[in-house]
Amino acid sequence: MVVLRSSLELHNHSAASATGSLDLSSDFLSLEHIGRRRLRSAGAAQKKPAATTAKAGDGSSVKEVETYHRTRALRSLRKDAQNSSDSSFEKNVEITEQLANGRHFTRQLARQQADKKKEEHREDKVIPVTRSLRARNIVQSTEHLHEDNGDVEVRRSCRIRSRYSGVNQSMLFDKLITNTAEAVLQKMDDMKKMRRQRMRELEDLGVFNETEESNLNMYTRGKQKDIQRTDEETTDNQEGSVESSEEGEDQEHEDDGEDEDDEDDDDDDDDDDDDDDEDDEDEEDGEEENQKRYYLRQRKATVYYQAPLEKPRHQRKPNIFYSGPASPARPRYRLSSAGPRSPYCKRMNRRRHAIHSSDSTSSSSSEDEQHFERRRKRSRNRAINRCLPLNFRKDELKGIYKDRMKIGASLADVDPMQLDSSVRFDSVGGLSNHIAALKEMVVFPLLYPEVFEKFKIQPPRGCLFYGPPGTGKTLVARALANECSQGDKRVAFFMRKGADCLSKWVGESERQLRLLFDQAYQMRPSIIFFDEIDGLAPVRSSRQDQIHSSIVSTLLALMDGLDSRGEIVVIGATNRLDSIDPALRRPGRFDREFLFSLPDKEARKEILKIHTRDWNPKPLDTFLEELAENCVGYCGADIKSICAEAALCALRRRYPQIYTTSEKLQLDLSSINISAKDFEVAMQKMIPASQRAVTSPGQALSTVVKPLLQNTVDKILEALQRVFPHAEFRTNKTLDSDISCPLLESDLAYSDDDVPSVYENGLSQKSSHKAKDNFNFLHLNRNACYQPMSFRPRILIVGEPGFGQGSHLAPAVIHALEKFTVYTLDIPVLFGVSTTSPEETCAQVIREAKRTAPSIVYVPHIHVWWEIVGPTLKATFTTLLQNIPSFAPVLLLATSDKPHSALPEEVQELFIRDYGEIFNVQLPDKEERTKFFEDLILKQAAKPPISKKKAVLQALEVLPVAPPPEPRSLTAEEVKRLEEQEEDTFRELRIFLRNVTHRLAIDKRFRVFTKPVDPDEVPDYVTVIKQPMDLSSVISKIDLHKYLTVKDYLRDIDLICSNALEYNPDRDPGDRLIRHRACALRDTAYAIIKEELDEDFEQLCEEIQESRKKRGCSSSKYAPSYYHVMPKQNSTLVGDKRSDPEQNEKLKTPSTPVACSTPAQLKRKIRKKSNWYLGTIKKRRKISQAKDDSQNAIDHKIESDTEETQDTSVDHNETGNTGESSVEENEKQQNASESKLELRNNSNTCNIENELEDSRKTTACTELRDKIACNGDASSSQIIHISDENEGKEMCVLRMTRARRSQVEQQQLITVEKALAILSQPTPSLVVDHERLKNLLKTVVKKSQNYNIFQLENLYAVISQCIYRHRKDHDKTSLIQKMEQEVENFSCSR
C-alpha cells in the first residue's frame, strides 16, 4: 500500500485546531492498510497520558526535542532525496500478515505488538519476489533512516498536522498533491495487474479438479502455496493464514472475497473511533519520503507454466447437469480426504455456476468460445430434460440411461442401432426378385470373389428402394442386416434415418456424412442404409436452401467421387421417387432401382403364411387363399395388422372380463380360437394404407353381386387377352412360375438356342466368314416366342345405363389386372386440382403411363367425359395417345352408357369393332338371377335367431387372478456367472466402505472411536451398553462380508453414536466433548456417503441382497478363510490335540467376528419364555379330553424345542464360531419357529374342517355351474334341466349365485338378473314353411326377367330389409307374408 505522510515536524498540540480541514480529509489521503491503522490507534491510546504529563511538566524540554528532530529530519531529507517513498509499506504488510492470524483485534494485542515493533522490523523483512525496484529502494531508505535516528524512531502518520510549519512548505505541499494522485493511480494499476496475473494462474491451474488437491505431495503443495502467497502479499485480497494444509487451499480459492470484505467493513468502523488516538502517535512521522516522483515500473517475474497432474480416474459421482467446472477460472474443489466438511459447503458450488469470470488479457475469440460452450451445455441439458419421459423422474432412471443422457445420446454418431434379429429373408414374402438382386450385390462378392476377379468387374454398389408406404422397404433392409450378421464373414450394417445427419451447425451435417463413410470404409465390407433419403438428398434448385445443396453435393462426392468408396453398399429407401436429386439415379451411385409395389394375390398369400406360421393350429391354405383374394389393395403392413386385429377380436370374444380389470387373470389359451368372423371384423375396421389418401379404382366383385356378374367379368377378360396379351402373361403367371427360383422365368436368358461365341478363340471358320459378312450377334428386335406383342391395345365396355359396366365390371377387370399400374383419367382427376390445368394433368398421366409400361389408362364414362372437356384437352388427349409407340403395352380401358354407334366420331375412331375392342354387356339370364336370390330367400330367411346364452355364460365366468410369473430357472453356469458379477459389485462396496472408515479413523477428532472400550477402565460400560461398536469392529465386519448395503454400514455408525450418547452424560466437559464428536462422526459419515455414493449403486446392492435371499445364497460364501487364527498353544500335550475332521472343517469356515469392544458376556440362566412370546396361545375351546391332552403334549414339545434352540443360539454367540452372519441366524431361527407354529396350526385345522363339511356339500352345485360355464359349449337347456331336476337344490343354486354376484358385477359386463333371465328362458322351436319360400324364389326370378343390375340390387335390398325386421322371430310365417307382399308391390319404375 502507498501511504501519504505529513511533514516531519513534531506534533504541536496548540496547532491542532488549525489543521481541522486537512484532518477531515485524512481518510481519503490515507491508503494505509486498516490493520496498521488500528494498531497505531491502539498504541496511541496507550501512550497519550504519558505524553500529556511530560508536556505539562516541562515545556522547554519539548522545544529542545522539537528542534533536535527538525534538524535530524532536514539532514535526512537532503541525504535521501533520491530514495523518498513509502518506507512504511513493507512494514505495514508484515504487520498485516502477522495480525491476520488473529482475525479479532484487542487493545492488549495492540500494546504487545507496539512494544515489539522494533524487533519485528529488523527480523522479519520479507521482500516479495514480485515487487519492483521501487520496493527495494524503500527497504534501503528505511534502514538508512533507522541508522541516522539511532534509537529514536520516526513515527508515521497519515495526516498533515500543520499547514504552515516545515521547510519549504509550498514545494512540499505541491509535491504532496501530485504524489497523491500518482500514488492512487499507481495502486489501482497494481491491483488490476495482480488480479489479472492471478486469474491467468488460476486458469492454468484450472485443470486441477476436486480429488487432485488431496493427491498432491507435501513438496508440490508447499510450492503452490508459495506461489499463491507471493501474489497475495502484493494485493489486498488475502488476510487469513492457512490453518491446515487442506483447508487453506480451499480458503484461498473460495473465501478470499467474502472474508476480506467483511473484515474491511469492520476495520472502517473502528477507524472512525480511533482518530483522536492516532494524533499523538503519528506526529513524529516525516514527509521527506513523498518528495520523489514515481519512475518507470519494473516488469514482474515470469511465472512459468507447470504441467498439471493427470486427472485420477476415481472421482465423485458425476453430476447430471454439470459435467465439469462452470468456468475455467473457477475450478471446483471437493472435500478433503482428511477432514470432510459439512454439506453446507455446497452453497459456493451452486453460486459458482452463476458467476462469469472475465479476463481482460484474454482474446475476444477465446471468450466467445467459452461463452459458446457454456450456452451449448445449457441448451443440451434443457433438451435432455425435455426428452425425459413424463411419467419418470430423474432418480427412477437406470444408470445406463443416465449415462446416455449425459453424453447426449440423441446425436446420430453415438446413438446405437437396435435391430430385430428374428427378421430374415424367409420373413419377407412376395419380394423374391429383390432378395436375389441384393444377394448379387452383397453376398456373392464375399462367397464367390473369383468370379468377379476373372472378369475384372465390380458388383453394383448402390440400389434404391421406392414404392408406396408399407410395402417392405425397411423390412428388406432389416432382413439384409441380419443375414449379413450370420456366418464367418460378417458385414457391418450402418443405418441412418432421413434427418439423422442434419444439424443446425454449419458444416456439421457434411462432417457426419464423411465420418460415416470413413467408418464404413474402415470396417468394409459394409452397408449404409438411408431410410427416407428424400429428406436428406432432395432435388437441388435455385430456390432451395444452400445447406441442403451442400449436403447433396457431399453425398454425391462420397458415393462416386475421385476416391472410390470400395466395398461399401449404399441403399436408399423412399416413397417419393420424384423428390430425390436426379444425380443420384445413375450407375455408380444407385445402380439399381427396385419398385416395391402392392403385393398381388400370391404375394399376399405368402405374407399371410409368414404371419400365421407360428399359430397353433395353423389355418387352412384354402382359407388363406380366399383371404388373400379379398385383400386387394392391402400392403404387407396392412396384412400384418389384419392378423393382429383378428387375434385381438378372438380374445375379446372369448374373455371379455379382462377389459374390466387391471389385474392379470388366468386364461385358458387353448380356448382362444380365431375364426373367419374375426378376420371379417378386422377387415371392416381396417382401411388399407393405399386407399386412405387415394381410392384405387380396382375392386373385386362383392359377394352379393358375384353370382350375378362373375360370368360377365370372365368374358371381358377373355376378350381382353386377345387384345392385350400381357393380361394373360400376368393372370396365368402363377400356373407355371417357380417361386423358389424366380430368375428362371426369363425364357430369353435361359433358352437352349445355339448362339454364336463372342470370343476370339471360340469362333470357327464358318463363324469367322459370317462375321466378315456383317453377321449380327445381337438380335435386339422383338421375338414373338419370348415376349407378347400387341398393337395399341384398347377396349371399350359398352352397355345400357344400369348394367353395371362402370360400377362393377370395369373395377373387377382392373382388380384382375392388379399387377399393372393403373392411371385414372376421369373428370374429378382433371378438374379436382386447381393448381394445374386439365391439359397439364392429362399430359402428365399419359407420360407416366408410358414410362411405367405395361400399364393401364382408365377413362370411365367416356361419353360424358368427351362432352364436358374442351377442344384443347381433346386434341391433347388424342395427340398423346398417337405418340405412344405402336407396340407399347399401354392399355386404354373405357366404359360407356351409350352404344358405340351413338358416340362421337373421334371416340369411335379410338375403338374399332373389327379388332374386338368393343364389349357389349348383356342382361343377367335366369340362372344367374336364381343364384343371386337363392341364398337370400332360402337360407337367410329360414335362419333361427341368434342365441345369447353362450355369450352370457362366458360373461358370467369369474376368472381367478393369475399369480405373478415365476422367474426362469437359471442353469449352473448362469448361477455361477451371476454370483461372480454380484461379488464384483460387493467388492466395490467393500472398497468404498473401507475408504470411508479409513477417512474417519485418521481424523484426530474421532480417535476415541477407533478402538473398543476397555472394560478395566469403565467396568459399568457392559451393563449400560448392550451392543458395543467401534470402527475396528466395523473394519472386521467389512472383511467378513457382513455389509451387503450401505444401510447396514450406517446402522453400525448410528450404533456408535447412540452408544456414546447413552453412556456419556451431558454434565462433564469431557463427556460433552465425546458426545459432540460422536454426532460429528455420524454427520461426517452420512455426508461422505451422500456426496460420493451413487444412488444407482445402492439400489443395485439392495436388489442383489433380495435376490440372494430368494435364492438362499449365503453372503459368507466368499468370505476369506482362516480369518480367525487359533492362539498358539506351547504347553499343549500331544494327547490333547484334536484330530477330529469335523473340528477341522469348522476351522475352515469363516466364523462370526467378535468385536473388540464386545466384552465377554456373563452366563445367565435362560429365562423361560411365555406362550405369548412364542406366539402359540391356544384358543379356549370345549373339545374332548383326548384332543386336549394331545394338544398339551404338542405345546410342551414346542416349548422345549424353542428353549433348546435358544440355548444353542446363545452358546453360538458366546463362542463366536458360527459360520454365518447374525442376520442369517435370525432368519433361521424365525424359520424354525414358523415351522413349529405351522405344526401347531395344522393340529388346529381338524376342527375347522369338521365345521366346513356342510359348506363343502353346498358347493357341489356351484362346481357344476362353473364347469358348464368353463366349457362354453353347454346349451341352455342343460342348465334348465339341472334346475328342474334338482328342485330341492334350487335355493342352493340361487344362493351360490348371490355369493358370486359381487364378482360378476365387478366385471361390469352384464347384470346378474339379466343373465339369469336369459339363461332361464326356454328355447322355442323354429317354424319355417320352406315350400312357400321356394315358391317365392320362383316368383322373384320370373318377375325380374328384364331387370338390369341396379333394379335387381334394389329388389335384393327390399327383401333383405324384411328379413332384418323379423330376425328375432322363431315363427317365420309373418316374415314370409311380408316378403310376398313386398315382391308383389315392387315396381321397377325407378
Swiss-Prot record:
<dbReference type="InterPro" id="IPR045199">
    <property type="entry name" value="ATAD2-like"/>
</dbReference>
<keyword id="KW-0547">Nucleotide-binding</keyword>
<keyword id="KW-0010">Activator</keyword>
<feature type="compositionally biased region" description="Basic and acidic residues">
    <location>
        <begin position="223"/>
        <end position="232"/>
    </location>
</feature>
<feature type="modified residue" description="Phosphothreonine">
    <location>
        <position position="1149"/>
    </location>
</feature>
<feature type="modified residue" description="Phosphoserine">
    <location>
        <position position="60"/>
    </location>
</feature>
<feature type="cross-link" description="Glycyl lysine isopeptide (Lys-Gly) (interchain with G-Cter in SUMO2)">
    <location>
        <position position="1148"/>
    </location>
</feature>
<dbReference type="GO" id="GO:0005524">
    <property type="term" value="F:ATP binding"/>
</dbReference>
<feature type="compositionally biased region" description="Basic and acidic residues">
    <location>
        <begin position="1185"/>
        <end position="1200"/>
    </location>
</feature>
<comment type="subunit">
    <text>Interacts with ESR1 and NCOA3 and these interactions are enhanced by estradiol. Interacts with acetylated lysine residues on histone H1.4, H2A, H2B and H3 (in vitro).</text>
</comment>
<feature type="compositionally biased region" description="Acidic residues">
    <location>
        <begin position="244"/>
        <end position="288"/>
    </location>
</feature>
<dbReference type="GO" id="GO:0045815">
    <property type="term" value="P:transcription initiation-coupled chromatin remodeling"/>
</dbReference>
<dbReference type="GO" id="GO:0016887">
    <property type="term" value="F:ATP hydrolysis activity"/>
</dbReference>
<feature type="modified residue" description="Phosphoserine">
    <location>
        <position position="1139"/>
    </location>
</feature>
<keyword id="KW-1017">Isopeptide bond</keyword>
<keyword id="KW-0103">Bromodomain</keyword>
<dbReference type="InterPro" id="IPR041569">
    <property type="entry name" value="AAA_lid_3"/>
</dbReference>
<keyword id="KW-0539">Nucleus</keyword>
<feature type="compositionally biased region" description="Polar residues">
    <location>
        <begin position="1149"/>
        <end position="1160"/>
    </location>
</feature>
<feature type="modified residue" description="Phosphothreonine">
    <location>
        <position position="1323"/>
    </location>
</feature>
<keyword id="KW-0067">ATP-binding</keyword>
<dbReference type="GO" id="GO:0045893">
    <property type="term" value="P:positive regulation of DNA-templated transcription"/>
</dbReference>
<keyword id="KW-0597">Phosphoprotein</keyword>
<dbReference type="Pfam" id="PF00439">
    <property type="entry name" value="Bromodomain"/>
</dbReference>
<dbReference type="InterPro" id="IPR003960">
    <property type="entry name" value="ATPase_AAA_CS"/>
</dbReference>
<feature type="modified residue" description="Phosphoserine">
    <location>
        <position position="1200"/>
    </location>
</feature>
<feature type="modified residue" description="Phosphoserine">
    <location>
        <position position="1233"/>
    </location>
</feature>
<feature type="binding site">
    <location>
        <begin position="467"/>
        <end position="474"/>
    </location>
    <ligand>
        <name>ATP</name>
    </ligand>
</feature>
<feature type="modified residue" description="Phosphoserine">
    <location>
        <position position="165"/>
    </location>
</feature>
<feature type="region of interest" description="Disordered">
    <location>
        <begin position="216"/>
        <end position="380"/>
    </location>
</feature>
<keyword id="KW-0175">Coiled coil</keyword>
<feature type="modified residue" description="Phosphoserine">
    <location>
        <position position="337"/>
    </location>
</feature>
<comment type="function">
    <text>May be a transcriptional coactivator of the nuclear receptor ESR1 required to induce the expression of a subset of estradiol target genes, such as CCND1, MYC and E2F1. May play a role in the recruitment or occupancy of CREBBP at some ESR1 target gene promoters. May be required for histone hyperacetylation. Involved in the estrogen-induced cell proliferation and cell cycle progression of breast cancer cells.</text>
</comment>
<feature type="cross-link" description="Glycyl lysine isopeptide (Lys-Gly) (interchain with G-Cter in SUMO2)">
    <location>
        <position position="1128"/>
    </location>
</feature>
<keyword id="KW-0378">Hydrolase</keyword>
<feature type="region of interest" description="Disordered">
    <location>
        <begin position="1181"/>
        <end position="1242"/>
    </location>
</feature>
<keyword id="KW-0832">Ubl conjugation</keyword>
<feature type="domain" description="Bromo">
    <location>
        <begin position="980"/>
        <end position="1092"/>
    </location>
</feature>
<protein>
    <recommendedName>
        <fullName>ATPase family AAA domain-containing protein 2</fullName>
        <ecNumber>3.6.1.-</ecNumber>
    </recommendedName>
</protein>
<dbReference type="InterPro" id="IPR036427">
    <property type="entry name" value="Bromodomain-like_sf"/>
</dbReference>
<feature type="modified residue" description="Phosphoserine">
    <location>
        <position position="1302"/>
    </location>
</feature>
<dbReference type="GO" id="GO:0070062">
    <property type="term" value="C:extracellular exosome"/>
</dbReference>
